[in-house]
Amino acid sequence: MSYKCAVCGKGSRSGNTVSHSNKASKRLFRPNLQSLNILLNGIKTREYVCTSCIKSNKAKKAI
C-alpha cells in the first residue's frame, strides 16, 4: 500500500523529531488514510482516502 490518497494525492512528508536536548532525527508524517468504497470516475472501487477528503465530501461513498 502506498501512503497516498486516491482523491487528492496527499502523501507522506518528511520532517524531524526534536528531542528535549534539541537534537533532530528524521521521521515521516503520514496522512490518516481509511479504506473506503468510493465512486472514482463513475466506477465503484475500494480505495484509500484521507480523512480530510471524507469530511469535505470530496470522496463520494458508493453504497
From Swiss-Prot:
According to its record, what are the GO cellular component terms?
ribonucleoprotein complex; ribosome
Q: Which domain of life is it from?
A: Bacteria
Q: Which GO terms describe its molecular function?
A: structural constituent of ribosome
The UniProt entry's sequence similarity note says: Belongs to the bacterial ribosomal protein bL28 family.
User: Keyword annotations for this protein?
Assistant: Ribonucleoprotein, Ribosomal protein
Species of origin = Endomicrobium trichonymphae
Q: Does the keyword Ribonucleoprotein apply?
A: yes
- Record's NCBIfam families? L28
Q: Does the keyword Ribosomal protein apply?
A: yes
- GO terms for biological process? translation
**Mind telling me what this protein is named?**
Large ribosomal subunit protein bL28
InterPro entries cross-referenced by the UniProt entry: Bacterial_rp_bL28, Ribosomal_bL28, Ribosomal_bL28/bL31-like_sf, Ribosomal_bL28_bact-type, Ribosomal_bL28_sf
For this protein, the record's SUPFAM superfamilies field holds: L28p-like (SSF143800)
